[in-house]
Amino acid sequence: MRAKLWRWRWKILLGLVLAYLLTIFVLADWLVLTPIPGHVNAGKARRETLTVNGCALECWVCKSAALVDGTPQGYVLEFCGNATRAESIAEYVGDRWKNYPVETWVVNYPGVGGSAGWPRMSNIPPAALGAYDALAARAPDKPIFVEANSLGTTAALCVAARRDVAGCVLHDPLPLKQFILDHYGWWNLWLIAAPVAWRVPSELDSLQNAAHTSAPCVFIIAENDDFVLPKYHEQVIHAYAGEHRSLILHNKGHWDGVGPDTEQELQTDLAWLWANAKQK
């Protein structure tokens, strides 16, 4: 009887260990990225693929309203946030830049949408840098702005710290590793948070990347962000080396966009960014 009880205890312990290892090595990326499967309507956006490290990286492209002659005078490279597909925001991004003759390219990470590969955090840095390089090769003399929201700002800053981007638009940026440890560690005694944070690539260290970015930047900050608390946004802003402005979305949360009440202020900030774009 006692031997049978011990066997059951060992089976339970083994099951817990396997579940823990599954969380660390398999589910960690899913917990952070939460990729959305299936078809997503992209509206009027057109699909393009960039070849990055021999694999197809899917982008959804829109022309701004100001782009009337078909020749873009600049490009915007947008990286999606958590649980977001490029198809869902492509038209929104294009409309944001309506006053500038640009094309906006919104990237689906590897393993998301029509992009090849696996949805892993380790695949984001090479994909983000490869997307910039592929776009720059198409238009070597045109400025490229990087833009992102939330999780996507880690990819945008990864690129901005390593390439000659013209400028950045960062909505609710976060230092991902610190956020995971601080915000999620306490309730699981860091048994889950620490391994998940450990899997965040060093190339996605937003504080280090911000300190090595000289391009001008517009920060968009939700005043009442209760998901990624404003103190995390402030860490990135404080670390940012380049000239920057901050647009505060009053009474807005993490999932809120720029509304009519702040649209004019955003356009003023984009005009400043366009006028002060870093030259290659």
Say what each PLM segment does.
Residues 9-51, 58-60, 64:
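An N-terminal hydrophobic leader/cap segment in hydrolases
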Residues 57-134, 147, 154:
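Membrane-embedded segments
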Residues 158-209, 259:
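Hydrolase active-site cap/lid region
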Residues 234, 238-280:
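C-terminal catalytic histidine-bearing segment of alpha/beta-hydrolase fold enzymes
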